[in-house]
Amino acid sequence: MPTLPSPASPSSPPSAASSLPTSPASAADNQPHQRRDIAESFGGDAERYDRARPRYPDALMARIVAASPGPEVLDVGCGTGIAARQLTAAGCRVLGVEPDARMAELARRLDTGVAVDVARFEEWEPGERQFDAVVSGTAWHWIDPVAGAAKAAGVLRPRGLLSVFWNVALLPADLTGAVADACERVMPDSPFDFRAALTRPAAVPYRAILDKTADGIRTADGFGGTEQWRYDWEFTYTRAAWLDVMPTQGAFTRLPAEELAEVLEAAGSAIDARGGSITMPYATMAITAKRK
């Protein structure tokens, strides 16, 4: 399993990199939170998801802990508990909210200190519970940006922290091209715009999601100004390790086995041409705000 090092001194990723659409950010409707079929598909292989998905930079976790007025954290769309476990290790007490019962069950099993309520965040009933921080790791795009921000404001204590963040893999153009070619062959009707990913500037990955998130926070009117944090780092994957990551991405979670195998073979061949491994630049990007 790729265990990620803490990014000690971030450096800018190569300008040739592209961001593969691992969520429906480039879908025609640009409303990923309405795609419940994709949002709740990750539990089909929850153990692979937890094994293969990258962790978040230690520096980001430390900054969240430092900015939070206390240790009580709500993790929205917690999945298998990747960010939740990192935060509990940093001394926080974490409650997760997760719409997929399969993901929630694994999160509880992997860390008995993490409780998880199964619900869509917009419909979740918090009762009298309040929190010092609300976080969301690579999941906020599945939540209505205005309703989600309003819900977060409602459960945060005064000056509580909202921090939502994404790990964005900046794939080299040769790998992205090989994957896009295969995807267009096997998924001609996909809502994901794979070809557009080839020309998306690496300097602004997930820009539409980040802008929509910030706009939602402003519209909800429960927070002060937003800040954007960014951490650049890289990790070297073997061929097998990267092919373990790919089926956990939203573009591929519902793909039939035969079509998925064709996409993975294309990616594997591109990695083989690079000598059997690939050093993947990542940008971990966060939008944060303090409750009024």
Give, region by region, the residue ranges found by the protein language model.
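Conserved class I S-adenosyl-L-methionine
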Residues: 2-5, 22-68, 70-77
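Class I SAM-dependent methyltransferase SAM/SAH-binding core
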Residues: 80-124
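A short acidic, Gly/Pro-enriched loop at the edge of an enzyme's catalytic core
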Residues: 124-134
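A short SAM/SAH-binding and catalytic strip from SAM-dependent methyltransferases
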Residues: 133-146
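A short glycine-rich, Lys/Arg-flanked "PGG" loop and its adjoining helix->strand segment in the class I
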Residues: 148-158
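Conserved catalytic/acceptor-binding region of the Class I
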Residues: 157-232
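Conserved Class I S-adenosyl-L-methionine
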Residues: 203-292
